[in-house]
Regions:
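Long, charge-rich intrinsically disordered scaffolds of nucleic-acid metabolism proteins
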Residues: 2-120, 131
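Charged, alpha-helix-enriched surfaces in structured cytosolic catalytic cores
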Residues: 24, 49, 56, 127, ...
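Conserved NTP-handling cores and scaffolds of large molecular machines
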Residues: 33-40, 65, 140, 154-155, ...
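Hydrophobic (often cysteine-bearing) scaffold residues that line and stabilize catalytic clefts
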Residues: 93, 124, 176, 211-212
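Phosphate-backbone recognition surface of nucleic-acid-processing proteins
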Residues: 126, 131-204, 208, 235, ...
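Basic, amphipathic alpha-helical segments enriched in Lys/Arg and hydrophobic/aromatic residues
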Residues: 204-240
Length: 240
């Protein structure tokens, strides 16, 4: 079983165990498992891990390309030429990686079917599809509140007595949330259900960021229901 190390460490602090050694860690983990009884979840398959590695590598290449592009703006002469060559190489690597990701999805009967379902929703492309399949195997197996909390797009209350703080999202699976964010930027333009939901929030006076996070939640809820039911995009029939 794999558990969130932050949860275990917070549990240790809550029980007054501030020291940290291998032996103490083992005791804390045992006490955590006994007290909290986290729900066991299956480890990703070898294929899912391989797909996840490709998704991670793609993100690394994107970050490298962004960094090199920023350096190029200030470079001159031979250095700029070297950066141009490296940027071209990174573009080729990204193209090859995208083809490899597409091949992995198309050559797997299970993934091919799931990918077809997910990509039937406007705004959902190959990168979000591969990310969800590799890093969110619980998609379609949890209810809409549970999947939103797992990804980290469910706002949490911060209230105390008469004081009411702003609701904020926190925790969750950062890599999934980052790709979902980019997909939602597309969905608010191209997906009728997400676009109308986003626009209603804007018209009600919500800030762009608040409306966008809520739209991320909306898109994830739709994809969770589609995966659960094994059905392609049918806005009128999909429910949480």
């Amino acid at each position: 079983m794999v558990v969130n190390p932050r949860q275990v460490r917070d549990f240790a602090k809550a029980t007054g165990r501030l020291a940290k050694t291998d032996r103490l860690d083992a005791e804390v983990i045992a006490h955590f498992a006994e007290a909290v009884r986290p729900e066991p979840r299956a480890l990703p398959s070898a294929d899912a891990q391989a797909l996840g590695e490709l998704v991670t590598r793609r993100q690394q290449l994107i970050e490298m390309r962004t960094a090199e592009g920023n350096r190029r703006r200030l470079a001159t002469g031979r250095l700029r030429q070297q950066l141009d060559e490296h940027l071209a190489w990174l573009d080729r690597q990204l193209d090859d990686l995208d083809k490899e990701l597409d091949d992995m999805l198309r050559n797997s009967p299970i993934w091919r079917e799931q990918a077809d379902v997910l990509r039937s929703a406007k705004g959902v492309g190959p990168i979000l599809t591969a990310t969800l399949l590799s890093a969110l195997p619980e998609l379609g197996q949890l209810n809409h509140k549970e999947i939103a909390a797992l990804v980290g797009v469910a706002p949490f209350n911060r209230d105390s007595g008469m004081w009411q703080g702003k609701r904020q999202i926190w925790g969750g699976r950062g890599p999934v949330r980052a790709v979902l964010y980019m997909a939602t930027l597309s969905a608010v333009r191209t997906n009728p259900a997400v676009r109308s939901f986003y626009q209603r929030l804007i018209n009600a006076g919500k800030l762009h960021k608040v409306a966008l996070v809520a739209s991320m939640h909306k898109l994830l809820t739709i994809l969770n229901a589609m995966t659960r039911d094994g059905r392609h995009w049918q806005p009128a029939e999909i429910t949480p």
